Design a protein with these regions (language model features):
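Feature captures the catalytic ectodomains and active-site-proximal regions of enzymes
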Residues: 1-413
Protein backbone atom coordinates (compact mmCIF):
# COMPACT_ATOMS: atom_id res chain seq x y z
CA UNK A 1 0.00 0.00 0.00
CA UNK A 2 1.16 3.53 -0.84
CA UNK A 3 0.16 6.48 1.37
CA UNK A 4 0.04 10.22 0.58
CA UNK A 5 -0.81 12.98 3.07
CA UNK A 6 -1.53 16.37 1.45
CA UNK A 7 -1.72 19.43 3.71
CA UNK A 8 -3.02 22.79 2.51
CA UNK A 9 -1.75 25.00 5.32
CA UNK A 10 -4.41 27.29 6.79
CA UNK A 11 -7.04 26.55 4.09
CA UNK A 12 -9.96 26.39 6.52
CA UNK A 13 -11.73 29.65 7.33
CA UNK A 14 -14.83 31.33 8.75
CA UNK A 15 -17.86 32.35 6.64
CA UNK A 16 -17.07 35.57 4.77
CA UNK A 17 -19.86 38.15 4.42
CA UNK A 18 -18.65 39.46 1.05
CA UNK A 19 -19.11 36.01 -0.51
CA UNK A 20 -22.59 35.41 0.91
CA UNK A 21 -21.49 33.75 4.12
CA UNK A 22 -19.43 31.09 2.39
CA UNK A 23 -15.80 30.19 3.09
CA UNK A 24 -12.89 30.43 0.63
CA UNK A 25 -12.95 26.62 0.31
CA UNK A 26 -16.63 26.78 -0.63
CA UNK A 27 -16.23 29.36 -3.41
CA UNK A 28 -12.90 28.16 -4.79
CA UNK A 29 -12.98 25.87 -7.81
CA UNK A 30 -11.59 22.61 -6.42
CA UNK A 31 -12.62 19.68 -8.66
CA UNK A 32 -9.88 17.40 -7.36
CA UNK A 33 -10.58 17.88 -3.66
CA UNK A 34 -14.30 17.54 -4.43
CA UNK A 35 -13.57 14.26 -6.23
CA UNK A 36 -11.88 12.98 -3.09
CA UNK A 37 -14.92 14.01 -1.03
CA UNK A 38 -17.24 12.12 -3.41
CA UNK A 39 -15.15 8.95 -3.40
CA UNK A 40 -13.60 8.98 0.07
CA UNK A 41 -14.51 9.48 3.69
CA UNK A 42 -15.05 13.09 4.78
CA UNK A 43 -15.07 14.35 8.36
CA UNK A 44 -13.80 16.87 10.88
CA UNK A 45 -10.68 16.51 13.02
CA UNK A 46 -9.38 18.54 15.94
CA UNK A 47 -5.69 19.00 15.18
CA UNK A 48 -5.11 21.49 18.01
CA UNK A 49 -5.91 20.06 21.46
CA UNK A 50 -7.68 22.35 23.90
CA UNK A 51 -5.25 24.53 25.82
CA UNK A 52 -2.63 24.68 23.06
CA UNK A 53 -1.75 27.67 20.91
CA UNK A 54 -3.02 26.89 17.38
CA UNK A 55 0.40 26.91 15.75
CA UNK A 56 1.42 24.89 12.72
CA UNK A 57 3.82 22.97 14.93
CA UNK A 58 0.97 21.68 17.12
CA UNK A 59 -1.36 20.92 14.22
CA UNK A 60 1.25 19.13 12.10
CA UNK A 61 2.55 17.11 15.04
CA UNK A 62 -1.03 15.87 15.41
CA UNK A 63 -1.35 15.06 11.71
CA UNK A 64 1.94 13.15 11.84
CA UNK A 65 0.43 11.16 14.71
CA UNK A 66 2.20 12.64 17.73
CA UNK A 67 0.25 13.76 20.79
CA UNK A 68 1.41 17.36 21.38
CA UNK A 69 0.90 16.93 25.11
CA UNK A 70 3.57 14.24 25.07
CA UNK A 71 5.94 15.36 22.31
CA UNK A 72 5.74 19.15 21.95
CA UNK A 73 8.63 21.03 23.54
CA UNK A 74 8.61 24.17 21.35
CA UNK A 75 8.74 25.19 17.71
CA UNK A 76 12.42 26.13 17.71
CA UNK A 77 13.79 22.60 18.21
CA UNK A 78 11.62 21.26 15.38
CA UNK A 79 13.12 23.82 13.01
CA UNK A 80 16.59 23.08 14.37
CA UNK A 81 16.18 19.48 13.21
CA UNK A 82 15.46 20.68 9.68
CA UNK A 83 18.52 22.96 9.65
CA UNK A 84 20.75 20.13 10.85
CA UNK A 85 21.49 21.95 14.11
CA UNK A 86 22.27 19.39 16.79
CA UNK A 87 20.92 20.37 20.19
CA UNK A 88 22.50 19.09 23.37
CA UNK A 89 20.38 18.21 26.39
CA UNK A 90 20.12 21.72 27.89
CA UNK A 91 20.30 23.77 24.68
CA UNK A 92 17.26 25.92 23.89
CA UNK A 93 16.30 26.64 20.29
CA UNK A 94 14.20 29.74 19.54
CA UNK A 95 12.35 30.58 16.34
CA UNK A 96 13.90 33.86 15.22
CA UNK A 97 11.68 35.90 12.89
CA UNK A 98 12.93 38.87 10.93
CA UNK A 99 10.11 41.38 11.42
CA UNK A 100 9.18 44.95 10.57
CA UNK A 101 8.38 47.16 13.55
CA UNK A 102 6.85 50.60 13.01
CA UNK A 103 6.68 53.56 15.40
CA UNK A 104 3.31 55.27 15.77
CA UNK A 105 3.89 58.15 18.14
CA UNK A 106 4.96 56.63 21.44
CA UNK A 107 3.84 53.15 20.36
CA UNK A 108 5.77 50.48 18.48
CA UNK A 109 3.58 48.28 16.27
CA UNK A 110 4.15 44.87 14.65
CA UNK A 111 3.78 46.02 11.05
CA UNK A 112 4.88 42.78 9.38
CA UNK A 113 5.81 39.45 10.98
CA UNK A 114 7.64 38.49 7.76
CA UNK A 115 9.59 41.69 6.97
CA UNK A 116 7.90 42.03 3.60
CA UNK A 117 8.71 38.38 2.85
CA UNK A 118 12.36 39.26 2.61
CA UNK A 119 14.34 37.22 0.09
CA UNK A 120 16.52 34.29 1.15
CA UNK A 121 19.67 36.07 -0.02
CA UNK A 122 18.89 39.28 1.89
CA UNK A 123 17.93 37.35 5.01
CA UNK A 124 21.05 35.21 4.88
CA UNK A 125 23.19 38.36 4.77
CA UNK A 126 21.38 39.82 7.77
CA UNK A 127 21.55 36.65 9.88
CA UNK A 128 25.25 36.23 9.07
CA UNK A 129 25.79 39.83 10.21
CA UNK A 130 23.89 39.26 13.46
CA UNK A 131 25.94 36.13 14.11
CA UNK A 132 29.10 38.15 13.57
CA UNK A 133 28.04 41.06 15.80
CA UNK A 134 25.89 39.35 18.44
CA UNK A 135 26.94 35.70 18.34
CA UNK A 136 28.91 34.31 21.28
CA UNK A 137 29.80 30.89 22.63
CA UNK A 138 26.39 30.95 24.27
CA UNK A 139 24.28 32.60 21.52
CA UNK A 140 24.27 31.31 17.93
CA UNK A 141 22.23 32.45 14.92
CA UNK A 142 21.35 30.03 12.09
CA UNK A 143 19.93 31.10 8.74
CA UNK A 144 16.77 29.52 7.39
CA UNK A 145 14.50 30.80 4.60
CA UNK A 146 13.03 34.27 4.09
CA UNK A 147 11.92 35.57 7.50
CA UNK A 148 12.21 32.21 9.32
CA UNK A 149 15.45 31.65 11.25
CA UNK A 150 16.84 30.12 14.43
CA UNK A 151 18.63 31.27 17.56
CA UNK A 152 20.19 28.66 19.84
CA UNK A 153 21.06 29.44 23.44
CA UNK A 154 23.69 26.95 24.60
CA UNK A 155 22.83 25.46 28.00
CA UNK A 156 19.92 27.89 28.16
CA UNK A 157 17.77 25.33 29.91
CA UNK A 158 20.19 24.92 32.79
CA UNK A 159 21.69 28.41 33.07
CA UNK A 160 18.28 30.07 33.33
CA UNK A 161 15.42 27.64 33.92
CA UNK A 162 12.82 30.38 33.47
CA UNK A 163 13.70 30.77 29.78
CA UNK A 164 12.15 27.45 28.86
CA UNK A 165 8.80 28.37 30.44
CA UNK A 166 8.79 32.00 29.33
CA UNK A 167 5.62 32.87 27.42
CA UNK A 168 6.66 34.42 24.10
CA UNK A 169 4.00 35.48 21.58
CA UNK A 170 4.27 34.46 17.90
CA UNK A 171 4.57 37.66 15.83
CA UNK A 172 1.90 36.57 13.35
CA UNK A 173 -0.61 36.69 16.22
CA UNK A 174 -0.15 40.44 16.77
CA UNK A 175 -0.11 41.94 13.26
CA UNK A 176 -0.95 45.64 13.44
CA UNK A 177 -0.91 45.67 17.24
CA UNK A 178 1.30 47.49 19.71
CA UNK A 179 4.06 45.11 20.81
CA UNK A 180 4.45 46.38 24.41
CA UNK A 181 1.76 44.12 25.95
CA UNK A 182 3.37 41.08 24.32
CA UNK A 183 6.96 41.65 25.42
CA UNK A 184 8.34 39.59 28.33
CA UNK A 185 8.84 41.36 31.63
CA UNK A 186 12.16 43.18 31.93
CA UNK A 187 13.52 40.94 34.66
CA UNK A 188 15.38 37.64 34.97
CA UNK A 189 14.87 35.44 31.89
CA UNK A 190 12.65 37.99 30.15
CA UNK A 191 15.41 40.58 30.29
CA UNK A 192 17.70 38.34 28.25
CA UNK A 193 15.15 38.10 25.44
CA UNK A 194 14.39 41.82 25.51
CA UNK A 195 18.10 42.63 25.37
CA UNK A 196 18.65 40.42 22.32
CA UNK A 197 15.70 41.87 20.42
CA UNK A 198 16.57 45.47 21.30
CA UNK A 199 20.23 44.96 20.44
CA UNK A 200 19.28 43.53 17.04
CA UNK A 201 17.36 46.74 16.26
CA UNK A 202 20.50 48.79 16.80
CA UNK A 203 22.50 46.63 14.39
CA UNK A 204 19.77 46.39 11.75
CA UNK A 205 18.71 50.04 11.59
CA UNK A 206 21.40 51.08 9.11
CA UNK A 207 22.23 47.69 7.63
CA UNK A 208 22.84 47.94 3.84
CA UNK A 209 20.12 45.39 3.08
CA UNK A 210 17.55 47.48 4.93
CA UNK A 211 18.73 50.74 3.42
CA UNK A 212 18.35 49.17 -0.01
CA UNK A 213 14.90 47.77 0.80
CA UNK A 214 13.67 51.13 2.08
CA UNK A 215 15.00 52.85 -1.04
CA UNK A 216 12.91 50.42 -3.10
CA UNK A 217 9.81 51.02 -0.98
CA UNK A 218 10.07 47.59 0.68
CA UNK A 219 9.65 46.85 4.36
CA UNK A 220 12.93 46.59 6.29
CA UNK A 221 13.88 43.71 8.56
CA UNK A 222 14.50 46.08 11.46
CA UNK A 223 14.25 43.64 14.37
CA UNK A 224 14.37 40.00 15.34
CA UNK A 225 11.47 38.47 17.27
CA UNK A 226 12.14 35.42 19.43
CA UNK A 227 9.50 32.81 20.29
CA UNK A 228 8.73 29.08 20.25
CA UNK A 229 11.68 28.04 22.43
CA UNK A 230 12.31 24.50 23.62
CA UNK A 231 14.61 21.51 23.94
CA UNK A 232 14.96 18.76 21.38
CA UNK A 233 12.04 16.28 21.65
CA UNK A 234 12.48 12.52 21.77
CA UNK A 235 10.15 11.01 19.17
CA UNK A 236 9.39 7.44 18.10
CA UNK A 237 9.69 7.19 14.31
CA UNK A 238 6.87 6.24 11.94
CA UNK A 239 8.90 3.20 10.91
CA UNK A 240 9.06 2.05 14.52
CA UNK A 241 5.32 2.63 14.95
CA UNK A 242 3.91 1.53 11.60
CA UNK A 243 6.76 -0.07 9.68
CA UNK A 244 6.75 2.54 6.90
CA UNK A 245 9.52 4.54 5.22
CA UNK A 246 8.85 7.77 3.42
CA UNK A 247 9.51 11.37 2.51
CA UNK A 248 8.42 14.83 3.57
CA UNK A 249 8.02 17.61 0.98
CA UNK A 250 7.84 21.20 2.22
CA UNK A 251 9.64 24.53 1.92
CA UNK A 252 8.99 25.22 5.60
CA UNK A 253 11.74 24.18 8.03
CA UNK A 254 9.21 23.41 10.75
CA UNK A 255 7.48 20.75 8.66
CA UNK A 256 10.75 19.28 7.43
CA UNK A 257 11.99 19.15 11.02
CA UNK A 258 8.96 17.21 12.22
CA UNK A 259 9.36 14.86 9.27
CA UNK A 260 13.02 14.24 10.05
CA UNK A 261 12.29 13.58 13.72
CA UNK A 262 9.55 11.19 12.57
CA UNK A 263 12.19 9.28 10.61
CA UNK A 264 11.29 10.54 7.13
CA UNK A 265 13.69 11.78 4.49
CA UNK A 266 13.38 15.30 3.08
CA UNK A 267 12.67 15.15 -0.65
CA UNK A 268 14.22 18.26 -2.18
CA UNK A 269 12.01 19.86 -4.83
CA UNK A 270 13.51 22.65 -6.97
CA UNK A 271 11.77 26.00 -6.86
CA UNK A 272 9.69 25.59 -3.72
CA UNK A 273 9.51 28.76 -1.64
CA UNK A 274 6.80 28.52 1.02
CA UNK A 275 5.02 31.39 -0.74
CA UNK A 276 2.65 32.03 -3.66
CA UNK A 277 5.44 31.61 -6.22
CA UNK A 278 6.28 28.07 -5.13
CA UNK A 279 6.65 25.15 -7.53
CA UNK A 280 3.22 23.60 -6.91
CA UNK A 281 3.36 21.11 -9.76
CA UNK A 282 6.86 20.05 -8.76
CA UNK A 283 5.58 19.08 -5.32
CA UNK A 284 3.00 16.80 -6.89
CA UNK A 285 5.46 15.30 -9.36
CA UNK A 286 8.11 14.65 -6.73
CA UNK A 287 5.51 13.11 -4.42
CA UNK A 288 4.77 10.56 -7.13
CA UNK A 289 8.49 9.89 -7.61
CA UNK A 290 8.78 9.36 -3.87
CA UNK A 291 5.97 6.81 -3.91
CA UNK A 292 7.85 4.80 -6.53
CA UNK A 293 10.69 4.31 -4.02
CA UNK A 294 9.00 4.31 -0.62
CA UNK A 295 5.57 3.80 0.94
CA UNK A 296 4.69 7.21 2.39
CA UNK A 297 4.89 10.88 1.35
CA UNK A 298 3.81 13.94 3.36
CA UNK A 299 3.23 16.96 1.10
CA UNK A 300 2.83 20.40 2.67
CA UNK A 301 1.87 23.65 0.89
CA UNK A 302 2.13 26.97 2.73
CA UNK A 303 0.48 29.44 0.33
CA UNK A 304 -3.14 29.42 1.63
CA UNK A 305 -1.85 30.20 5.11
CA UNK A 306 0.12 33.19 3.85
CA UNK A 307 -3.01 34.58 2.19
CA UNK A 308 -4.92 34.13 5.44
CA UNK A 309 -2.29 36.08 7.35
CA UNK A 310 -2.57 38.84 4.77
CA UNK A 311 -6.36 38.92 5.07
CA UNK A 312 -6.64 38.75 1.28
CA UNK A 313 -9.71 36.84 0.05
CA UNK A 314 -8.74 36.88 -3.62
CA UNK A 315 -5.27 35.54 -2.91
CA UNK A 316 -6.58 32.82 -0.60
CA UNK A 317 -9.13 31.56 -3.11
CA UNK A 318 -6.47 31.64 -5.83
CA UNK A 319 -3.95 29.78 -3.63
CA UNK A 320 -6.55 27.08 -2.87
CA UNK A 321 -7.41 26.70 -6.56
CA UNK A 322 -3.77 26.42 -7.63
CA UNK A 323 -3.14 23.93 -4.80
CA UNK A 324 -6.08 21.85 -6.01
CA UNK A 325 -5.08 21.94 -9.67
CA UNK A 326 -1.32 21.58 -9.53
CA UNK A 327 -0.68 19.62 -6.34
CA UNK A 328 -3.81 17.54 -5.69
CA UNK A 329 -4.61 17.14 -9.38
CA UNK A 330 -1.09 16.04 -10.27
CA UNK A 331 -1.07 13.48 -7.47
CA UNK A 332 -4.54 12.07 -8.27
CA UNK A 333 -3.59 11.65 -11.92
CA UNK A 334 -0.34 9.88 -11.03
CA UNK A 335 -1.61 7.50 -8.35
CA UNK A 336 -3.63 5.63 -10.96
CA UNK A 337 -0.37 3.81 -11.71
CA UNK A 338 -0.30 2.27 -8.22
CA UNK A 339 -2.26 -0.89 -7.43
CA UNK A 340 -3.06 0.06 -3.82
CA UNK A 341 -3.02 3.65 -2.61
CA UNK A 342 -4.57 5.84 0.07
CA UNK A 343 -4.73 9.64 0.15
CA UNK A 344 -5.44 11.87 3.14
CA UNK A 345 -6.02 15.57 2.54
CA UNK A 346 -6.67 18.35 5.05
CA UNK A 347 -5.68 21.81 6.28
CA UNK A 348 -3.56 21.77 9.42
CA UNK A 349 -5.60 24.56 11.06
CA UNK A 350 -7.81 27.48 10.01
CA UNK A 351 -6.18 30.82 9.20
CA UNK A 352 -9.30 32.98 8.92
CA UNK A 353 -9.14 36.13 6.83
CA UNK A 354 -11.02 38.10 9.48
CA UNK A 355 -8.43 37.53 12.23
CA UNK A 356 -5.30 37.03 10.06
CA UNK A 357 -3.85 34.38 12.36
CA UNK A 358 -4.32 30.72 13.26
CA UNK A 359 -7.36 29.47 15.17
CA UNK A 360 -8.05 26.15 16.87
CA UNK A 361 -11.36 24.99 15.38
CA UNK A 362 -11.58 21.47 13.90
CA UNK A 363 -10.75 21.23 10.19
CA UNK A 364 -12.18 19.12 7.35
CA UNK A 365 -10.30 16.01 6.28
CA UNK A 366 -10.85 13.36 3.66
CA UNK A 367 -9.36 9.88 3.35
CA UNK A 368 -9.56 8.09 0.01
CA UNK A 369 -8.60 4.49 -0.77
CA UNK A 370 -8.71 2.83 -4.18
CA UNK A 371 -9.53 -0.47 -2.50
CA UNK A 372 -13.18 -1.46 -2.80
CA UNK A 373 -15.40 -2.39 0.12
CA UNK A 374 -14.30 0.32 2.54
CA UNK A 375 -17.05 2.15 4.41
CA UNK A 376 -17.20 5.81 3.37
CA UNK A 377 -18.73 9.14 4.44
CA UNK A 378 -19.07 10.86 1.10
CA UNK A 379 -20.10 14.39 0.12
CA UNK A 380 -20.25 16.44 -3.06
CA UNK A 381 -17.68 19.02 -1.96
CA UNK A 382 -14.62 19.32 0.26
CA UNK A 383 -15.26 22.17 2.66
CA UNK A 384 -16.03 22.99 6.29
CA UNK A 385 -19.83 22.67 6.01
CA UNK A 386 -19.80 19.34 4.16
CA UNK A 387 -17.35 17.94 6.71
CA UNK A 388 -19.58 19.03 9.59
CA UNK A 389 -22.62 17.41 7.99
CA UNK A 390 -20.78 14.12 7.53
CA UNK A 391 -21.18 13.21 11.20
CA UNK A 392 -17.62 11.88 11.38
CA UNK A 393 -15.55 13.69 13.99
CA UNK A 394 -12.09 12.80 15.31
CA UNK A 395 -11.53 14.54 18.66
CA UNK A 396 -7.92 13.48 19.13
CA UNK A 397 -6.14 14.61 15.99
CA UNK A 398 -3.05 12.52 16.62
CA UNK A 399 -5.21 9.38 16.24
CA UNK A 400 -6.11 10.27 12.64
CA UNK A 401 -2.86 8.80 11.29
CA UNK A 402 -3.81 5.41 12.73
CA UNK A 403 -7.18 5.60 11.01
CA UNK A 404 -5.35 6.43 7.78
CA UNK A 405 -2.58 3.84 8.01
CA UNK A 406 -4.40 1.03 9.78
CA UNK A 407 -8.17 1.25 10.12
CA UNK A 408 -11.19 1.67 7.88
CA UNK A 409 -11.46 5.48 7.47
CA UNK A 410 -15.26 5.48 7.69
CA UNK A 411 -15.56 3.59 10.96
CA UNK A 412 -16.58 5.35 14.16
CA UNK A 413 -14.82 3.14 16.69
Amino acid sequence: MKYVVIVGDGMADYPVESINGKTPLMVARTPNMDWLAKHGSLGLVRTVPEGFNPGSEIANLSIFGYNPLQYYTGRGPLEAASLGVELKKDDLAFRCNLVTLHSQGSKVVMEDFAAGHISDAEAHEIIAYLEQEMGTEEIRFYSGLSYRHLLVMKNGGSVCSGLERLGLTPPHDIIGQEIAPFLPENKDSGRRILTLMTESQRFLKEHPVNLDRKAKGLRPANSIWLWGQGRSPQMVTLKERFGIDGYVISAVHLIKGIGLLAGLEVLQVPGITGYFDTNYEGKGEYALRGLEKKDFVYVHVEAPDEAGHMGDLRLKVEAIEVFDEKVVGTILKGIKDFEKVKVMLLPDHPTPLSVRTHTAEPVPFVIYSNETGEKKHTADTFDEVSALKSGLFIEKGYELIERFLIRNPGSHE
